[in-house]
Amino acid sequence: WYDFLLYGITAALVFNREFFPQISPAMGTLAAFATFGVGFLFRPLGGIIFGHFGDRLGRKRMLMMTVWMMGIATALIGVLPSFASIGWWAPVLLVTLRAIQGFAVGGEWGGAALLSVESAPKNKKAFYSSGVQVGYGVGLLLSTGLVSLISQLTTDEQFLSWGWRIPFIFSVVLVIAALWIRNGMEESTEFEQQREKPVVKKRLPVRS
């Protein structure tokens, strides 16, 4: 959630100037928030695709993939050249990376919630699954706090030039930590039992 929400915070402060300077400030802000919305459009698609393969290949494997996708997309935003450097390719690449973020978080949300419920004791399933929602708040606090800290430690010119990029690149640290944690996880017992069951293919009746 840190990566996904960080984009929205920075879009309001920087992206209208860095990636949409060719239009008016008001329209640039609207364009920046429009790219923010792209992530939400791709979330359902990510949930469907990762959910489909998660039922066949495992929740853990899909969650490892979503972390990789989210981390790489976020870090690349942190090193993405501005409109002044590469022209229209800058906003095009920004939208593409935002779409990848949305696609990844769609799979992350459903997969993490499902794994939490399946791995929890029978009398604590609701409590364990609430951790997914808690992660949203933690990500919001961390992203907001880091952007605020860097903006206080830099001048306006420095923040617009390179300071805003630091929280995005910092995502690499969080990705490494998340991969280390998830590598030690095990698939839920429910999934393992379901995978061991023989698959029965039902034939559809053919009308004469």
Question: Where are the regions that the model predicts?
Answer:
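Glycine-rich segments within core transmembrane alpha-helices of 12-TM secondary carriers
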Residues: 104, 124-151, 173-174
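Cytoplasmic helix-loop-helix junction between adjacent transmembrane helices
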Residues: 87-134
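Helix-loop junctions at membrane interfaces in 12-TM secondary transporters
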Residues: 26, 79-96, 153-160
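Central cavity-lining transmembrane alpha-helices of secondary-active solute carriers
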Residues: 33-52, 61, 66-75, 138
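Flexible cytoplasmic inter-helical loops of multi-pass small-molecule transporters
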Residues: 183-204
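Extracellular/periplasmic helix-loop-helix junction of adjacent transmembrane segments
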Residues: 11-45, 63, 83-92
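Symmetry-related core transmembrane helices of the 12-TM Major Facilitator Superfamily/SLC fold
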Residues: 161-179
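C-terminal ends and interior cores of transmembrane alpha-helices
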Residues: 21, 68-87
